[in-house]
Amino acid sequence: ALETDCLNLNERIKAEDTSSVQTEENVILVTPTYAWRIPHIVSDWLGKAELVGAKRIWFVMDCGSEIGNAAKYNRELAARKKLTYMGTAQIVMPENYIALFSAPDKQEAKAIVENAKPAIRSIIDCIRNGMEFPAPRNNLYDRFMSGAVNPIFCKKIVKADAFTVSDACIGCGKCVQLCPLNNIRLDKDK
């Protein structure tokens, strides 16, 4: 809808490639929400990579229910990058962190995606018109979840231990290709 070039951060992160990236003036970072913030691997990568040509940045975060006070940390990241912070927007999408939460069934997932369309249109309109996103909710709960809970949640809860192979594995290797941390490998095609 915005007709702009895309950069696959997963490929860059997986390859540990923090070389400079030629960008347009406007950068739109679309990322999942991990524990009420952007994933640490994404913020770490952004902290190291130079965005040549970038002047403004919008953060678009998909989430299962909420992004907490991620905007505070995104604003700080933008300041460190010397970019004009244009806001943080959330798009509620089907839960996909299956190690901890249940994914919705197909019908419920379709309904969640359909319900997200007005938010997506609003986000596109803001970016297209060079406008800041409206400030997201920021209450005590949001600040607590993104602040005190995030580091504990990431250290104690967000682990790969819950991901194991089963007889359903067909040995296609897709999980190996997609894992940005390179911590999945096939052993005897499983």
What is each residue range found by the language model?
Residues A1-R12, S19, T23-T31, A35-I152, ...:
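FMN-binding flavodoxin-like domain, especially the glycine-rich phosphate-binding loop
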Residues T164-V165, I170, K174-K190:
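Iron-sulfur cluster-binding cysteine motifs and their immediate structural context
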